[in-house]
């Protein structure tokens, strides 16, 4: 599946994956408000075998099929300074 990744200008390390380029209508209004204006970052072919830095590719694919988007939040800092 071809995916399109956008980063948030308001929330560091927060990304939205879309199944269709610039299809922001699938994103719920409250999430749009918090996320802010999306900035296009990357386009790539996502398969279950592909390695992603912070996400399970099968979970991302399932979310894209079910909702049309996938939200990637920043990793939790398990040991804050």
From Swiss-Prot:
Q: At the top level of its lineage, which domain of life is listed?
A: Bacteria
What's one Pfam family the UniProt record gives for this protein?
YcgL
Residues in YcgL domain copies: 1-81
Which InterPro entries would you find in this protein's record?
A: YcgL-like_sf (IPR038068), YcgL_dom (IPR027354)
The entry's protein name is YcgL domain-containing protein Tgr7_3126
Q: HAMAP family annotated for this entry? A: UPF0745
Q: Which organism is it from?
A: Thioalkalivibrio sulfidiphilus (strain HL-EbGR7)
């Amino acid at each position: 599946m071809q995916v399109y990744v956008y980063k948030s200008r308001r929330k560091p390390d927060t990304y939205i994956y879309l199944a269709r380029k610039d299809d922001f209508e699938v994103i719920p209004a409250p999430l749009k408000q918090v996320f802010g204006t999306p900035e296009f970052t990357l386009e790539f072919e996502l398969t279950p075998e592909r390695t992603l830095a912070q996400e399970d590719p099968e979970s991302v694919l399932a979310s894209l099929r079910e909702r049309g988007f996938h939200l990637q939040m920043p990793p939790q800092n398990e040991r804050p300074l």
